[in-house]
């Protein structure tokens, strides 16, 4: 069994490419996961699709075959050639895949280092795949350790001491271009976590905030929680020409603000499009200042410089957590093998005991004593060997040892991990 992660992120792909690779709703995500798992060598998969990344994390029996299947599937859906996808993607397998997963969960791979949204997005992606039967024990183990690693990073470093997000960075950008936002009318489109954070930051800065959404009662609920006002989505065509400030982060697959509804204004407008695919597509409007996710990089770089020390410490934690994860996986392989060795030895002792009794070498009335004695002999003989097997599970040569023992006891390696329940998998689900 192998782990494989194919990653398209803000580090290797343009916004245009990420838009084409994005999956905006549950229906599309389910279709993608179904096609992923239809690959001959892929047995479990998780799809992570956010404004800054699209990643496939899977377990597979053959890395080359699984990689080929994933690229063919993504190319067919997105219209981006396989050559371009291969040129852009970061491909991680086995230990590097786990290391990358832990980095993503700990927000070390985020555009905004230390942002807290990615952990929730990762949990949502895992739950969706798990609840719909697209992943099970193999990925659940990795995800559980990823969340544990993220918690260690948060507790041991200061990278999340001042929580930041793309939304808070966008509001910071607004403040850098506008001297004062107090009293200015600001429209927030959408009701997701990013919209909520944006609305709260704008309100705390004194802006007059309105929230709108296709589903009005959701806008009313968020506005009530934040202390904002509600704007009917049907009035969006008026609002874009009346409001000075606009933030949008919807899950629409098509732009919702286009040339058709934009009119000339005698004041500057500041629009922030944090959606992928983008919500705004226009070709006119001289006094419109539009910022998309990738335009926030300057502030992000400043954020990174503030958190460099914490990030270095976090990388060390992630490295150690990766090693500990594979040591733990090795113990899952070792214990079943030790159990099977004992079972085979006891069965051989039982057969031999019955044989000598049947031949009359030992009286029948001593049968129980013979069984106990033979088992005690075997336990004494196997104890030292099993102790060494357990101790070596934390060493680099563990893989060689487990392969050799699997060969000797004629056990299929693919059977072993799934035979033993991961006690953490249910905890992840129950801890939602």
Curated annotation (Swiss-Prot):
It is an enzyme of class 1 (oxidoreductase). CDD domains: NAD_bind_Glutamyl_tRNA_reduct. NADP(+) binds at residues 190-195. Its EC number is 1.2.1.70. PROSITE patterns: GLUTR (PS00747). It comes from the Bacteria. Signal peptide: none annotated. The active site is at residue 51. One of its GO terms (biological process) is protoporphyrinogen IX biosynthetic process from glutamate. Keywords: NADP, Oxidoreductase, Porphyrin biosynthesis. Substrate binds at residues 50-53, 110, 115-117, 121. Pathway: Porphyrin-containing compound metabolism; protoporphyrin-IX biosynthesis; 5-aminolevulinate from L-glutamyl-tRNA(Glu): step 1/2. The record marks 100 as: Important for activity. It catalyses: (S)-4-amino-5-oxopentanoate + tRNA(Glu) + NADP(+) = L-glutamyl-tRNA(Glu) + NADPH + H(+). Catalyzes the NADPH-dependent reduction of glutamyl-tRNA(Glu) to glutamate 1-semialdehyde (GSA). NCBIfam families: hemA. HAMAP family: Glu_tRNA_reductase. Homodimer. Possesses an unusual extended V-shaped dimeric structure with each monomer consisting of three distinct domains arranged along a curved 'spinal' alpha-helix. The N-terminal catalytic domain specifically recognizes the glutamate moiety of the substrate. The second domain is the NADPH-binding domain, and the third C-terminal domain is responsible for dimerization. During catalysis, the active site Cys acts as a nucleophile attacking the alpha-carbonyl group of tRNA-bound glutamate with the formation of a thioester intermediate between enzyme and glutamate, and the concomitant release of tRNA(Glu). The thioester intermediate is finally reduced by direct hydride transfer from NADPH, to form the product GSA. This is Glutamyl-tRNA reductase. The gene is hemA.
């Amino acid at each position: 069994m192998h782990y494989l992660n194919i990653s398209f992120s803000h580090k290797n792909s343009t916004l245009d490419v990420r838009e084409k690779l994005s999956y905006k709703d549950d229906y599309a995500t389910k279709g993608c996961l179904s096609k992923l798992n239809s690959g001959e060598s892929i047995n479990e998969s998780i799809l992570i699709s956010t404004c800054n990344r699209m990643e496939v994390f899977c377990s597979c029996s053959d890395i080359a075959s699984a990689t080929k299947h994933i690229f063919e599937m993504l190319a067919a859906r997105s219209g981006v050639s396989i050559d371009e996808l291969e040129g852009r993607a970061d491909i991680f397998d086995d230990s590097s895949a786990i290391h990358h997963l832990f980095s993503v969960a700990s927000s070390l791979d985020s555009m905004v280092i230390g942002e807290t949204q990615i952990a929730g997005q990762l949990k949502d992606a895992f739950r969706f795949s798990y609840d719909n039967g697209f992943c099970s024990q193999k990925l659940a183990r990795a995800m559980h350790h990823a969340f544990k690693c993220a918690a260690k990073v948060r507790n041991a470093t200061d990278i999340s001491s001042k929580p930041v997000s793309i939304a808070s960075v966008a509001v910071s950008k607004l403040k850098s271009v506008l001297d004062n936002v107090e009293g200015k009318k600001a429209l927030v489109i959408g009701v997701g976590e990013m919209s909520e954070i944006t609305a709260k930051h704008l309100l705390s800065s004194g802006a007059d905030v309105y929230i709108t959404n296709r589903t009005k009662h959701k806008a009313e609920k968020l506005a009530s929680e934040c202390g904002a006002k509600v704007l009917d989505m049907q009035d969006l065509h008026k609002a874009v020409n009346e409001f000075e400030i606009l933030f949008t982060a919807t899950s629409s697959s098509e732009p919702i603000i286009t040339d058709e509804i934009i009119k000339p204004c005698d004041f500057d407008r500041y629009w922030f499009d944090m959606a992928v695919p983008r919500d705004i597509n226009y070709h006119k409007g001289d006094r419109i200042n539009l910022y998309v996710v990738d335009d926030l990089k300057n502030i992000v770089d400043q954020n990174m410089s503030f958190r460099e020390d914490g990030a270095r410490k976090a990388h060390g934690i992630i490295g150690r957590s990766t090693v500990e994860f594979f040591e733990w996986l090795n113990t899952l392989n070792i214990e079943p093998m030790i159990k099977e060795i004992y079972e085979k030895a006891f069965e051989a002792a039982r057969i031999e005991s019955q044989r000598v009794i049947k031949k009359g070498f030992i009286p029948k009335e001593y049968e129980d004593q013979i069984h106990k004695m033979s088992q005690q002999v075997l336990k004494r003989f196997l104890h030292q060997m099993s102790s060494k097997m357990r101790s070596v599970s934390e060493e680099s040569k563990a893989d060689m040892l487990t392969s050799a023992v699997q060969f000797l006891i004629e056990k299929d390696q693919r059977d072993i991990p799934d035979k033993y329940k991961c006690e953490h998998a249910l905890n992840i689900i129950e801890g939602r």
